[in-house]
Structures are given as structure tokens and as C-alpha cells.
């Protein structure tokens, strides 16, 4: 309890400083560096504020609507009780701070804002850019950052950073990369790794640690490679890691590579984010390759309640993947759709990598013919467990991987139909209680199958359609069905939601013995205070508690009639939703009075609303509504009832 209170106190301190000290105002349009820095007489340049020593409780204000070009080097630290705050004043658009297109001479800077060996600070309501086009003598050509926080001294710990309501966009190095420029995949990989470009970077030299970071309610777009990059330069054998990172309620749109990349972190929580088109290639400079999230040499990484749409790229580019040598990675309650690489990717050297209660729709459509470098038959996967780590020819199989209670659907047809590979090279892998569904000419596991785990435990999975027979036969207690999913014959809903007679209800194996839930190490950090050690609900918040006969798949609903609930008054207003999985319209039962309705996305934004008359039992989805996770709210004059739904408007396209 004391640990939880301490973390909550830090969050509270982000909202206000207990003892505000100096206030500095800057305006690039009306300021002058000879002014006194007050709101009435603001300074003008980043150089002026860079040469000002800041202390605990200080606040730096940038004028909204202004653009500040150059290099802001933060000089000074706050304390845990009195943070330094960087924010805005006035009206209009967020102030822009850019390290490029300035008149300082000497070329574009490596980053717009640099924090070196300073800590205890808040960045709130700023827009950060850094599109480098002019070389600088002390900066590599393939490097660019928006904000860089760094420890460059051994055994120095930096604490308490908050980034909220921020925008990171238009961050590029001098040059780009295109797969067509290479004829060797290894040379391409080296070139890819050489790009150090991100909107927000945390870097620790050997022996240094950055601790207690929150990035929330922020927007990332038009970035050449990475949204947020956390790095620690400690040796592989070292136990030094950056600690306690939280990324929540952020939106990432058209990022050239990965959205969130934790490298050598311990305790990282990534939740309630929208990842839309990672691995984008909207211009020649963009990298064009990336899973939304992947981790490397990290401990205790929880990735939950996110949505990933349309990840692309020549390699990786799954929705969320587990890279090399991690311990306790939990990927749960996420929705992934149209991700080019596939669904599950667990590379070598991991312990307890877990995919559970996720929904995957049309993931794994990559074709090797789309890339001149790629000539391997398993380039796209439904499940991929690799036993290799980068830089080693030895086998490093991952131990105790769990893949359970996921719903996996591939239903593209015609020229868009595709099949996937399944490769399992691990130790003590468990695959149970999953739905694998393929139809319309698409398939799962027929492209290639490699199964190299003598201790593979696979049971109580449901198979429908064109699924590899080899994969099916590995299941000791499989459920084979023809379609028993709701509304397939009608065609106005997605065909992969269970209905009353579905054979997936109560058909799963119990969570006991070899199939017991792996525990999340929630006591390892305060950031996990609201994370459950063991799951008690399914993807749609249906209860799992005490269930000795769970369903197969991501939904544990026991009937077709799924009630919208008021959690504090669960017996009122018995309105039912026919289907959690929606493509064109929401079908309801029991609408015996009028309601206002709203569809709210995972960032809390109302994306569609209207009026539902009594006895009208359908809501037509707006064409502009994108795929993802929503909460449906029905409200009358006294009460509000809700249900979680998934909207699947597949935007499958193999072309950028």
C-alpha cells in the first residue's frame, strides 16, 4: 500500500507544483531577449532559455501559435515535490519547438530539446518537430530526435518525467531507406539498424538509469522511424535497466517504424493506446517497417487494451511482438487487424511470453513477392516462435510461452485471400482455448509449418475452415466445427462472434495445472497497482472468476444475449446486444424506451452519437468510423448502460 501511495503522490504532483518559483515566458513573434521574461515582456529565443538556470518549481511558458527554432538545452532539475514544468500560454495551436529550419548556422540540430543529467520535470501541451535537411558537423546524418533525455555519467539516476498532451511529428534524419536499394537482406538490416530517429528518446549510458516516466494523452505522427525509444547501453550481462515506464492513452498515426520500443527496461506498462499504421511508408524517407510495440532484453512488460491497425513492413511488422531475451511479457486484451507480418511473434531467448484474450483479424498477409529482398516462405505468420537471437548462431528457444483464449480470424476473399505460416521452435509452449477461423479462400498454417517443441501442450482449440491439418492434429482435444458463428448466413455482421449454440461455450480447458494462468508480477512496481495478477475478465469484460469451464476464444459470454450494464445498478434496464463484433450495424434487443447513444473510443473520445427511439433496435455505423475498440453507451434521463464492442471495418490493402 505504501508503494502505491508513493506512486499516486508522484502523479498528483504532476498536476501542480507545491511551491511555484520562477516563471519565464517566451514568444518568437513578439518577444525580445532583452526583455525581463515576464508575460508582458517575454523572451524570444531558445538560446535565451537554454542559458537560464532553472530550479525546483520553475515554469517555462511558450506562446501558443508561435514556432521556436533552434536548440533548447534544459539547464536545471526540479525535485520530486517541486517539478520544473514546460508548457504553453495564450490561445491558438500548440507552440512548436523545432531543431531544424533555423538561422543559427552550422546545420540542423540532433534534437529540438535536450535534457542531460537533469530530472524531475513535466512537458505539457507542446508540439515537437525536427526534420533535418542540413548536415551538422557533430551529428550523424542518420540521427534525429524530437526530445532526448539522456544520462551520460555512470551511476547517475534520473527520476520523474511526465509528458502529457504533447504532439510529436515531422522528425526525420537527412536521408531515408528503401528496400529496393539493396540486394542483400543482411546489408539492408545493418542499414535499417543505423537509423536512430524518434519523436521521444530516453538513453542511459552504461551504469545510468532513468526511472519513473509517464507518457500520456499525446499524439505521435509523421515520424521517420520510432515514436518513443527507451535505451540502456549496459552490457547484456548487466542488470542495469531503465525502470518504471508508463505509456497510456496516446495515439500513434502513420509512424515509419515502431510506435513504442522499450529496450532494457524493467517494469513497463503500455495500455489504452491507438496504433494506426505503424511501419508506414508515406514518403521516400520513411523506414516503412515496424510492429506497433516490441521489447528487447526487458523484464516485466505489460501491453494491454491497445488497438493496432495495419502494421506494415518487410520484416517483423506484427501487431505486437516479443523480441529477444525478455522475461515476463504479457500481451493481453488487444485488438489487432490487417497487420502484414502476422499475429504472434516470439523471438529467441524469452521466458514467459504470453498472448491471451486478444482478437486478431486478417493478420499475416505479407507476400514475399512484394519485397525483392525477402525470399523466405514463412514471411507471414499466425504463430511464430523463433529460437535465434541477433548476432548468435546458437539456438536460444523461448521457454514457457503461453498462447490462449485468443480469437484469430482470417476471412479475406478473392485476390485478397491469403494463407499464413506457423513455426514453433520453443520449449514448454502452451496453446489452448483459442479460436482459429479461416474461410473465403484464406487459410491458417498451410503456407509452412515447423513444429519443434517436444513439450508442446496444445488442447481445446476450436478450428474452422482452411486450417493446416498438421496444426490441428497437434491438439489433444480439439473442437472442429462448421460455422456456428452468428449471422454468417445473413452477412450483415462479422461471422466470428459466438452465438447461443456455439460449441465454443464452456468448451475450454480449465485454468489449472499446466494450463493455469501465468501470474503478472504486479508487486514488482507501483505502476502495476491497477493491473490484475491473474485475469478475472475476458476481452469484453465478461467474468472469468471461478469458471471451471471457460469458453474457447476471447469472449467468455455464456449466451447470445449480452447485457449492457450499469455497473453500480446491474439489474436495471435489460437491454441486450446481439454481438460484440460489429461491421455495419449494432443489433440490440429490449429497447423499450428511448435512449441517447454514443460510441466512445479507447481514448475517451465520442466518435459517433445519436438518438435511439423506443423499439428501434439497430444503430447503423457511420462510414467514417474506423476499426477498433469502442464502448457503446445508452443513456436515458436517469441511467447509463454500457457494453464493450469491436468494430471491424477491414481496410486490407497490400499497397501503401
What are these regions (language model features)?
Residues 25, 61, 596-600:
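Beta-strand signatures of extracellular beta-sandwich domains
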Residues 23, 52-98, 114-127, 153-167:
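Beta-solenoid repeat scaffold
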Residues 505-564:
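Surface beta-loop-beta hairpin patches that serve as ligand-binding interfaces in beta-rich domains
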Amino acid at each position: 500500500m505504501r508503494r502505491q501511495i508513493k506512486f499516486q503522490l508522484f502523479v498528483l504532483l504532476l498536476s501542480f507544483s507545491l511551491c511555484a518559483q520562477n516563471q519565464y515566458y517566451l514568444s518568437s513573434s513578439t518577444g525580445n531577449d532583452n526583455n525581463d521574461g515576464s508575460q508582458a515582456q517575454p523572451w524570444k529565443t531558445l538560446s535565451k532559455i537554454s542559458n537560464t538556470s532553472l530550479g525546483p518549481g520553475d515554469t517555462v511558458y511558450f506562446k501558443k501559435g508561435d514556432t521556436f527554432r533552434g536548440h533548447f538545452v534544459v539547464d536545471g532539475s526540479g525535485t520530486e515535490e517541486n517539478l520544473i514544468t514546460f508548457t504553453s500560454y495564450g490561445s491558438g495551436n500548440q507552440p512548436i519547438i523545432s531543431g531544424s529550419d533555423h538561422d543559427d548556422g552550422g546545420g540542423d540540430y540532433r534534437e529540438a530539446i535536450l535534457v542531460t543529467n537533469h530530472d524531475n520535470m513535466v512537458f505539457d501541451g507542446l508540439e515537437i518537430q525536427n526534420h533535418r535537411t542540413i548536415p551538422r558537423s557533430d551529428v550523424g546524418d542518420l540521427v534525429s530526435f524530437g526530445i532526448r533525455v539522456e544520462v551520460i555519467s555512470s551511476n547517475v539516476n534520473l527520476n520523474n518525467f511526465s509528458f502529457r498532451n504533447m504532439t510529436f511529428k515531422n522528425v526525420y534524419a537527412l536521408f531515408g531507406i528503401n528496400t529496393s536499394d539493396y540486394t542483400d537482406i543482411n546489408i539492408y538490416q545493418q542499414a535499417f539498424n543505423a537509423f536512430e530517429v524518434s519523436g521521444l528518446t530516453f538513453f542511459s549510458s552504461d551504469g545510468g538509469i532513468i526511472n519513473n516516466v509517464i507518457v500520456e494523452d499525446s499524439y505521435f505522427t509523421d515520424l521517420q522511424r520510432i515514436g518513443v525509444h527507451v535505451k540502456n547501453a549496459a552490457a547484456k550481462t548487466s542488470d542495469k535497466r531503465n525502470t518504471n515506464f508508463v505509456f497510456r492513452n496516446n495515439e500513434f498515426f502513420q509512424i515509419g517504424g515502431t510506435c513504442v520500443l522499450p529496450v532494457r527496461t524493467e517494469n513497463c506498462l503500455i495500455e489504452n493506446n491507438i496504433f494506426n499504421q505503424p511501419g508506414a511508408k508515406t514518403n521516400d524517407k520513411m523506414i516503412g517497417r515496424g510492429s506497433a510495440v516490441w521489447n528487447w532484453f526487458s523484464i516485466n512488460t505489460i501491453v494491454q487494451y491497445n488497438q493496432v491497425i495495419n502494421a506494415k513492413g518487410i520484416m517483423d511488422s506484427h501487431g505486437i511482438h516479443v523480441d529477444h531475451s525478455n522475461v515476463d511479457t504479457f500481451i493481453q486484451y488487444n485488438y489487432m487487424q490487417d497487420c502484414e507480418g502476422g499475429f504472434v511473434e516470439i523471438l529467441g531467448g524469452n521466458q514467459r511470453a504470453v498472448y491471451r484474450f486478444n482478437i486478431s483479424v486478417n493478420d499475416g498477409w505479407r507476400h514475399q513477392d512484394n519485397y525483392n529482398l525477402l525470399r523466405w516462405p514463412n514471411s507471414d505468420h499466425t504463430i511464430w516462435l523463433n529460437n535465434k537471437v541477433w548476432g548468435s548462431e546458437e539456438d536460444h528457444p523461448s521457454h514457457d510461452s503461453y498462447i490462449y483464449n485468443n480469437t484469430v480470424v482470417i476471412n479475406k476473399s478473392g485476390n485478397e485471400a491469403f494463407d499464413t505460416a506457423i513455426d514453433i521452435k520453443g520449449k514448454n509452449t502452451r496453446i489452448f482455448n483459442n479460436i482459429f477461423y479461416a474461410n473465403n479462400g484464406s487459410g491458417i498454417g498451410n503456407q509452412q509449418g515447423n513444429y519443434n517443441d517436444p513439450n508442446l501442450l496444445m488442447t481445446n482449440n476450436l478450428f474452422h475452415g482452411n486450417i493446416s491439418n498438421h496444426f490441428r492434429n497437434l491438439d489433444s482435444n480439439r473442437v472442429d466445427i462448421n460455422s456456428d458463428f452468428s449471422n454468417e448466413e445473413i452477412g450483415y455482421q462479422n461471422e466470428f462472434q459466438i452465438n447461443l449454440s456455439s460449441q465454443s461455450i464452456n468448451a475450454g480447458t480449465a485454468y489449472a495445472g499446466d494450463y493455469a494462468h501465468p501470474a503478472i508480477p504486479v508487486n514488482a512496481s507501483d505502476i502495476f497497482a491497477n493491473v490484475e495478477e491473474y485475469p478475472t475478465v475476458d476481452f469484453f469484460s465478461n467474468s472469468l472468476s471461478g469458471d471451471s469451464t471457460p469458453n474457447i476464444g476471447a469472449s467468455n459470454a455464456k449466451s447470445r444475449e449480452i447485457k449492457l450494464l450499469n455497473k453500480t445498478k446491474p439489474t436495471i434496464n435489460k437491454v441486450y446486444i446481439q454481438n460484440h463484433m460489429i461491421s455495419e450495424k449494432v443489433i440490440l434487443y429490449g429497447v423499450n424506451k428511448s435512449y441517447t447513444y454514443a460510441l466512445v473510443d479507447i481514448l475517451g473520445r465520442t466518435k459517433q452519437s445519436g438518438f435511439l427511439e423506443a423499439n428501434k433496435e439497430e444503430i447503423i455505423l457511420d462510414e467514417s468510423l474506423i476499426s477498433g475498440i469502442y464502448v457503446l453507451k445508452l443513456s436515458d434521463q436517469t441511467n447509463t448502460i454500457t457494453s464493450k464492442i469491436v468494430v471491424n471495418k477491414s481496410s486490407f490493402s497490400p499497397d501503401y
